[in-house]
Amino acid sequence: QSLIETGLKQNTDLLSAAQNVKAAEASLMSARLAYAPSLGLSPQGTISSFDKNAATKTYSLPVTASWQVDLFGQLLNSKRNAQVTLKQMKAYRQAVQTQVVSNIANMYYTLMMLDRQLEITKATAEILKKNAETMEAMKDAAMYSINSAGVEQSKAAYAQVLASIPDIEQSIRETENALSTLLGEAPHAIKRGELEAQVLPTELSAGVPIQLLSNRPDVKAAEMSLASCYYNTNSARAAFYPQITLSGSAGWT
């Protein structure tokens, strides 16, 4: 549980997805503000003097305002596109979060499985070593018709099992490094329990209704991506039509 909490806070892919959500929120705010009139202020001031007379100060404050009439739906489609893009980014973030949790749990149980495999392999190697030593002693004592072929075969079995231990240890290190990267940390040893101590569910679900598939974040993201393409197309079509802008200006001098 602590590893999952760490991954949800520090995983780089999840942090990137969160930044994408913030960018989509900013784009939606910009699309909403496009409906509001735009105002412009350009205050000016001059000081002039002729023939050593008193200086004359002149001030002006022109104000301009313009408002685009969304007659053909360009602004509307841009806003809707921003809305579905925000939903898409949120669904993508949820999908990344689900994947991060799944990968952390999978690697954690893989490490415990490798630990158990290493323990069994070392115990097996010890048994085969004692077996080879016993057969060697029996051959030297000429007991039970033990020949050299049998002794060499037992030694070969021991050597084969012994040679597999470094491979398992390498797999453990690689899995720890991959899990550390997933947690957003430098490679280090992962503290973990034993496989036998884990409590697994006794009842497994047979499946989910097909209606619930629409709740999957990746399905939602794909749906919102399709909607975004639709609104982008409508906005591009509206751009072919003339834009109607109402503008006005006022000033004070």
Task: Please report, for each region that a protein language model flagged, where it lies by residue.
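Short, polar/flexible loop-turn hinges at active-site or ligand-entry regions and domain interfaces
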Residues: L71-R80
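Conserved anionic group-binding/transfer micro-motifs
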Residues: A17, A82, M89, I168, ...
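A small-residue-enriched
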Residues: E5-D70, S102, E174-I190, E196, ...
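Mature N-terminal segment immediately following signal peptide/propeptide cleavage
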Residues: Q1
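Periplasmic alpha-helical coiled-coil/stalk elements that build and connect Gram-negative outer-membrane
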Residues: V84, A91-V208
